[in-house]
């Protein structure tokens, strides 16, 4: 019996070249994690909220996907889409680059703004998209943020912005830098009106965005492991000629030094934002206490010094957490003092 044509002929290794080798896996089926280098199925990553199932690394999330994760279905209303682009420095190739990214991403710029509901809480939402020139802040990005915040002030709505950026957009020069002051001024007016602004920092948040709207939130949250800073660690290391502390400019480092109020897992982000927004909604008290006075006085002067010490050391003495549980329905701890402390 002859088996000449029964088995598929294989090519020897020595005859393989870069041109003849073709991927055996269909394009778009697998995604490589930049941290653990594992190849994971794209669908598995999607089902896990774009978190690596092997090492927990957070993949970057596109703006519309973020909206789907955070906003109640069907509630997002986009604002200020299609604002005209400018090229103030007449930078060569800038217009063509913008047009190419618009076609590739389906976005008009590096941020998506609009109104949404988060578990029924009306909110103005802004989401940066790193695919669009690393979400750098140019005139259109600054204008969209400013318009969204000003409208939120008029309609007395809270603002939530998911920041992700490489900083100011160098192709627009001083016009880009002006957006830092412009967005900050709008947020100051929003704050003066007594309204809430929550900033959520994702990987990476750097440059002029860090120096403006990203770090101006009443409450500042971050995703685990996010790089947050003005200049990047490589630039700082080369400038000062010294080794940087372990974890420098990571979200955990900033939380430890008082610049963040909390680090929130992506799977818990919507629930956390919903809880914070609900706490800041104006609501009438569910009930007013009508009972008798429950406090009673004990004269400590009747006790000896040692008896007072024993009372202070009593293991059954209520702690701060005990009082919080008794007095409030919900409590969310905020860490940041913005002074390099807690």
Describe these PLM feature segments.
Residues 109-112, 215:
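Glycine-rich, charged/polar anion/phosphate-binding loops
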Residues 25, 44, 108, 144, ...:
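Residue-level preference for nonpolar/small residues embedded in alpha-helices
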Residues 165-285:
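Conserved catalytic cores of soluble enzyme domains
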Residues 52, 125, 164, 214, ...:
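Terminal peptide-recognition signature
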Residues 1-107, 115-118, 271-342:
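Intrinsically disordered, low-complexity segments enriched in small/flexible residues
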Residues 28, 47-50, 62, 140, ...:
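Charged, alpha-helix-enriched surfaces in structured cytosolic catalytic cores
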Residues 32, 51, 112-115, 124-126, ...:
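Structured core elements
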Residues 112-191, 198, 338:
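Cleft-lining beta-strand/loop regions that shape enzyme active-site pockets
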């Amino acid at each position: 019996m002859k088996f000449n044509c029964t088995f598929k002929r294989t090519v020897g290794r020595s005859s393989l070249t870069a041109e003849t080798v073709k991927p055996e896996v269909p394009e778009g089926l697998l995604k490589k994690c930049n941290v653990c280098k594992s190849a994971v199925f794209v669908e598995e990553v999607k089902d896990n909220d774009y978190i690596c199932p092997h090492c927990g690394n957070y993949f970057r999330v596109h703006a519309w996907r973020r909206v789907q994760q955070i906003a109640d279905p069907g509630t997002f209303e986009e604002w200020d889409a299609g604002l005209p682009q400018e090229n103030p420095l007449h930078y060569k190739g800038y217009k063509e680059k913008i047009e190419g990214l618009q076609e590739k991403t389906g976005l008009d710029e590096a941020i998506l703004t609009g109104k949404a509901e988060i578990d029924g809480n009306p909110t103005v939402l802004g989401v940066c998209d790193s695919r669009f020139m690393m979400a750098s802040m140019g005139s259109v990005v600054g204008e969209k943020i400013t318009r969204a915040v000003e409208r939120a002030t008029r309609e007395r709505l809270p603002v939530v912005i998911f920041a992700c950026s490489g900083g100011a957009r160098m192709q627009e020069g001083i016009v880009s830098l002006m957006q830092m002051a412009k967005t900050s001024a709008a947020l100051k007016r929003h704050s003066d009106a007594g309204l809430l602004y929550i900033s959520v920092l994702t990987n990476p948040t750097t440059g002029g965005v860090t120096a403006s709207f990203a770090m101006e939130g009443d409450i500042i949250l971050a995703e685990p492991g996010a790089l947050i800073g003005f200049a990047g660690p490589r630039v700082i290391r080369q400038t000062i000629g010294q080794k940087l502390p372990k974890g420098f400019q990571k979200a955990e480092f900033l939380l430890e030094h008082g610049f963040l109020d909390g680090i929130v897992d992506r799977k818990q982000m919507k629930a956390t934002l919903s809880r914070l927004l609900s706490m800041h909604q104006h609501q009438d008290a569910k009930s007013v206490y009508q009972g008798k006075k429950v406090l009673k006085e004990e004269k400590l002067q009747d006790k000896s010094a040692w008896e007072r010490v024993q009372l202070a050391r009593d293991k059954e003495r209520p702690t701060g957490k005990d009082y919080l549980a008794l007095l409030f329905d919900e409590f969310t701890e905020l860490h940041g003092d913005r002074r390099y402390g807690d």
